[in-house]
């Protein structure tokens, strides 16, 4: 599955460079219009991030998120500041298809355990974001000593199967995805579904990932810079 990405900041679609809130570029002041273009191209999935929420630890762009849910038929996965069961409940209740728990998976693993038990593994995704294969937290503002392997192994043990893995050094850089890391994790943990995030520069990066065994791929900056088109993504969307 191909997931075009929309990152929300102050109600607008933006992109950040390596997760730096000071390095922001506006993609579209109207995220709903952008989502409808994705849907019109025949793509069926959307990766949505509330960047304000990631920093604040609570829903910030809820009105925009609700309008995207109500006015498109896209399968929406949503992340950004989801740190309580109440927030998980709130988003799933408005029709978000699955939610991504990031920082909280490291700091409050019991939240993930409870959420998976209550809603099922198809509704709960764990975000594994970091630098040098060490997990970063709090909207990528803090670094930890926990390795990618450790968090995936721990979360598999509580029933998680889907993991969005982001190498922050690649995010928003068009430098190519870290295929070695992603395929290594997928091979080491065959019961997991590793979702690639960060670094896609062209359509070959997408097909190379697919050939390596990674089938769920998030595409952000390359799409909005024009290096990858919606039509190209539709062609390779399995």
Curated annotation (Swiss-Prot):
Matches recorded under Gene3D superfamilies: Aldolase class I
EC number: 5.3.1.16
Any one GO cellular component localisation term in the record: cytoplasm
GO molecular function, one term: 1-(5-phosphoribosyl)-5-[(5-phosphoribosylamino)methylideneamino]imidazole-4-carboxamide isomerase activity
Pathway entry: Amino-acid biosynthesis; L-histidine biosynthesis; L-histidine from 5-phospho-alpha-D-ribose 1-diphosphate: step 4/9
Top-level class of the enzyme under EC nomenclature: isomerase
Active site positions: 7 (proton acceptor), 129 (proton donor)
NCBIfam families on file: 1-(5-phosphoribosyl)-5-[(5-phosphoribosylamino)methylideneamino]imidazole-4-carboxamide isomerase
Similarity comment: family membership: Belongs to the HisA/HisF family.
Record's protein name: 1-(5-phosphoribosyl)-5-[(5-phosphoribosylamino)methylideneamino] imidazole-4-carboxamide isomerase
Species annotation: Leuconostoc mesenteroides subsp. mesenteroides (strain ATCC 8293 / DSM 20343 / BCRC 11652 / CCM 1803 / JCM 6124 / NCDO 523 / NBRC 100496 / NCIMB 8023 / NCTC 12954 / NRRL B-1118 / 37Y)
The gene coding this protein: hisA
